[in-house]
């Protein structure tokens, strides 16, 4: 199954890795494919997720050239018949090994940055609480395209740090403007956070949605059902459930907080 999914995107993957190698050798230590491609299968709107580890920080010329070339290998969901959205996260070895929280991210590329990149705006290195989640994902399910396996290269993330990162993520969503236009992703991400808070593991979005569905009061189940169906390729109608959606967000945040504190 996993090999078939990777084969499905092998041409695009080769192009992306080629760009990374061209710009980052000889500082490149590892490239790991993680996310839907290796855990749960690619869905219609799934990104190709790559974690890249290097030995030194990127200079500004390399950063800009790499990002501009990555832009040519990626497309927003639904905009290309041959390209998927690509998300690339780059970390410097000594920033994350040994592990400490919160960790520093050297670079992140994704389709949400396209307009900024075209306008000449490039995100600098920054502290990123999500690295606790990302590295946990990579250690649990990933394929090393370059370098050693993730579980050999990276330290395990302590559960306390994972929970802290999950809890911090909850602060992003407080009122409808916070999820407007991104309803499906927010619903599914909340389901994953809830799943992770209870189990200490990370699941594909549709698996976490099924898990959450079994634990939700009946009045919130249509919200997660709509999100799951949209994730699998059906029409996204979540915006029409504004009141239910807001109640769902606050309910699930409350359930998560019971587990992770604050």
UniProtKB/Swiss-Prot annotation:
Pfam families the record matches: AadA_C, NTP_transf_2
Domain of life: Bacteria
Keywords of the record: Antibiotic resistance, ATP-binding, Nucleotide-binding, Nucleotidyltransferase, Plasmid, Transferase
GO molecular function (one): aminoglycoside 3''-adenylyltransferase activity
Reaction catalyzed: streptomycin + ATP = 3''-O-adenylylstreptomycin + diphosphate; spectinomycin + ATP = 9-O-adenylylspectinomycin + diphosphate
Keyword Nucleotidyltransferase among record annotations: yes
Alphabetized InterPro entries for the sequence: AadA/Aad9, AadA_C, NT_sf, Polymerase_NTP_transf_dom
Chain's role: Mediates bacterial resistance to the antibiotics streptomycin and spectinomycin.
Protein name, as recorded: Aminoglycoside (3'') (9) adenylyltransferase
Organism encoding this protein: Shigella flexneri
């Amino acid at each position: 199954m996993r090999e078939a999914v990777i084969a499905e995107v092998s041409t695009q993957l080769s192009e992306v890795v080629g760009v990374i190698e061209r710009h980052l050798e000889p500082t490149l230590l590892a490239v790991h494919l993680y996310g839907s491609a290796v855990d749960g299968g690619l869905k219609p709107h799934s990104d190709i997720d790559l974690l890249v580890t290097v030995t030194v920080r990127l200079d500004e010329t390399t950063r800009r050239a790499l990002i501009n070339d990555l832009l040519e290998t990626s497309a927003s969901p639904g905009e290309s018949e041959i390209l998927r959205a690509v998300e690339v996260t780059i970390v410097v070895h000594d920033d994350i090994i040994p592990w400490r929280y919160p960790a520093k991210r050297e670079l992140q590329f994704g389709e949400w940055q396209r307009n900024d990149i075209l306008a000449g705006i490039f995100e600098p290195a920054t502290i990123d609480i999500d690295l606790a989640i990302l590295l946990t994902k990579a250690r649990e399910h990933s394929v090393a395209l370059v370098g050693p396996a993730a579980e050999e290269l990276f330290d395990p993330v302590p559960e306390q740090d994972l929970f802290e990162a999950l809890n911090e993520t909850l602060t992003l969503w407080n009122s409808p403007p916070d999820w407007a236009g991104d309803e499906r992703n927010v619903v599914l991400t909340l389901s994953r956070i809830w799943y992770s808070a209870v189990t200490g593991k990370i699941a594909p979005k549709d698996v976490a949605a099924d898990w959450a569905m079994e634990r939700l009061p009946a009045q919130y189940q249509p919200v997660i059902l709509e999100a799951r169906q949209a994730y699998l390729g059906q029409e996204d109608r979540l915006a029409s459930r504004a009141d239910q959606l807001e109640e769902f967000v606050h309910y699930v945040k409350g359930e998560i907080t019971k587990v992770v504190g604050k």
